């Protein structure tokens, strides 16, 4: 059974509020509750998934661990103290009572799914990777270390001390579940004795303490393709947690997070930057040097350029992901007012201002237009 992303299960974004998560869970739980779908295995499975996702995402500490480490961060056998694993409906405590106590009489429990003696696919993992804008634009290879679980080499995954074997659970007879009668409803519940495994370990392994798996770390080289954006996911098949009882391993999802850049702002495939130019260059025109991801480039500034004007350098943006196209670089020029002027500079500016007074509409069209609007406003 594949472990799905908890946010995808509830249909919410990763920045969803607690209230949004609760509303999403209530909607799904009402739709797929076993009492409303007594003969639907699909509804039963979706109800289970929604309950498990809500249990994790409604708890701030568990949610933080899940965001950082994925399913490994909330697997009780991983030593992180969260809920997870291959539980049935049991073990969710307040998550179920909080939502359904007022609907089904409080304290209700439901069960389903096989015990842990069945074959299960390993959990998917998530790794948040920070990269620079240059690395995102050109592509790169990064080495990462991820927390994971591996089969205990001492007991070979049985959880029992070498030389001993787990025994069949006397409570559920190895089924991993027990059935409870509550009023008109017959409800399955994870066995409280073996917690769904169908087995009891009377003499646990002194290395993994009965879990059958131990915490570990592994190093991977991840190829980041050119053009990735913030929040893109790179799937590494089979690099998640190992499966149980011979099941296939899960996948690792590397999520890219691009660091803020000192010069550029990214907008899809396009880049934006601000370039200060002098008053004289704006008025008379000239050539300036601007930065690009490929190095310095020349930009011709036409005469009479205004502050805020945007110049496009085609093909100087970000390469499209898995395509040959490139975005553009949008250069926003900002005309700087000169400061700390010398006496001579002040003299020349005063002379320029005096000359300009004779034809304000010609030399300062925006100012003249504004003055005309003021006259109309005041009835002048």
Swiss-Prot record:
Keyword check for Zinc-finger: yes
GO terms, molecular function: ATP binding; heat shock protein binding; unfolded protein binding; zinc ion binding
Residues passing through the membrane, by range: none
Zinc finger region(s), CR-type: 139-217
Residues reported in the UniProt entry to bind Zn(2+) 2: 169, 172, 191, 194
Pfam families: DnaJ, DnaJ_C, DnaJ_CXXCXGXG
Location within or outside the cell: Cytoplasm
Repeat positions for CXXCXGXG motif: 152-159, 169-176, 191-198, 205-212
Cofactor note: Binds 2 Zn(2+) ions per monomer.
GO CC terms, sorted: cytoplasm
UniProt keyword list: Chaperone, Cytoplasm, DNA replication, Metal-binding, Repeat, Stress response, Zinc, Zinc-finger
Disulfide bridge partners, by residue number: none
Domain notes: The J domain is necessary and sufficient to stimulate DnaK ATPase activity. Zinc center 1 plays an important role in the autonomous, DnaK-independent chaperone activity of DnaJ. Zinc center 2 is essential for interaction with DnaK and for DnaJ activity.
Subunit and interaction comment: Homodimer.
Role this protein plays: Participates actively in the response to hyperosmotic and heat shock by preventing the aggregation of stress-denatured proteins and by disaggregating proteins, also in an autonomous, DnaK-independent fashion. Unfolded proteins bind initially to DnaJ; upon interaction with the DnaJ-bound protein, DnaK hydrolyzes its bound ATP, resulting in the formation of a stable complex. GrpE releases ADP from DnaK; ATP binding to DnaK triggers the release of the substrate protein, thus completing the reaction cycle.
The protein's name in its UniProt record: Chaperone protein DnaJ
Classification of source organism: Bacteria, Pseudomonadati, Pseudomonadota, Betaproteobacteria, Neisseriales
């Amino acid at each position: 059974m594949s472990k799905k992303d908890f946010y995808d299960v509830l249909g919410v974004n990763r920045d969803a509020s607690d209230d949004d998560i609760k509303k999403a869970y209530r909607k799904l739980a009402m739709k797929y509750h076993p009492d409303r779908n007594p003969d639907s295995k699909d509804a039963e499975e979706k109800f289970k998934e929604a309950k498990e996702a809500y249990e994790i995402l409604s708890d701030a500490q568990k949610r933080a661990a899940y965001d950082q480490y994925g399913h490994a961060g909330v697997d009780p056998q991983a030593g992180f103290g969260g809920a997870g694993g291959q539980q049935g409906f049991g073990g969710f405590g307040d998550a179920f009572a909080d939502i359904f106590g007022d609907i089904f009489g409080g304290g209700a429990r439901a069960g389903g799914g096989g015990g842990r003696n069945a074959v299960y696919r390993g959990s998917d993992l998530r790794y948040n990777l920070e990269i620079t804008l240059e690395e995102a634009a050109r592509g790169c290879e990064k080495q990462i270390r991820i927390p994971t679980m591996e089969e205990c080499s001492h007991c070979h995954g049985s959880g029992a001390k070498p030389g001993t074997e787990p025994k069949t659970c006397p409570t559920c007879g190895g089924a991993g579940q027990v059935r409870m009668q509550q009023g008109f409803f017959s409800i399955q519940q994870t066995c409280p004795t073996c917690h769904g495994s169908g087995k009891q370990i009377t003499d646990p392994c002194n290395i993994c303490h009965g879990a059958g798996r131990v915490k570990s770390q592994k190093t991977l080289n991840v190829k980041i393709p050119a053009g990735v954006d913030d929040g893109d996911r790179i799937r590494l098949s089979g690099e998640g947690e190992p499966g149980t009882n011979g099941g296939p391993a899960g996948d690792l999802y590397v999520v890219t997070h691009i660091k803020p850049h000192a010069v550029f702002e990214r907008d899809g495939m396009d880049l934006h930057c601000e370039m200060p130019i002098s008053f004289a260059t704006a008025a008379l025109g000239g050539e300036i040097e601007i930065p690009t991801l490929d190095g310095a480039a020349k930009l011709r500034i036409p005469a009479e350029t205004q502050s805020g004007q945007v110049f496009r350098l085609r093909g100087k943006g970000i390469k499209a992901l898995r395509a040959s196209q490139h975005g553009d670089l949008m250069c926003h020029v900002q005309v700087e007012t000169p400061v700390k002027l010398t006496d001579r500079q002040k003299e020349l500016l005063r002379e320029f201002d005096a000359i300009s007074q004779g034809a304000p509409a010609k030399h300062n069209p925006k100012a003249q237009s504004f003055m005309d609007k003021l006259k109309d406003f005041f009835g002048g």
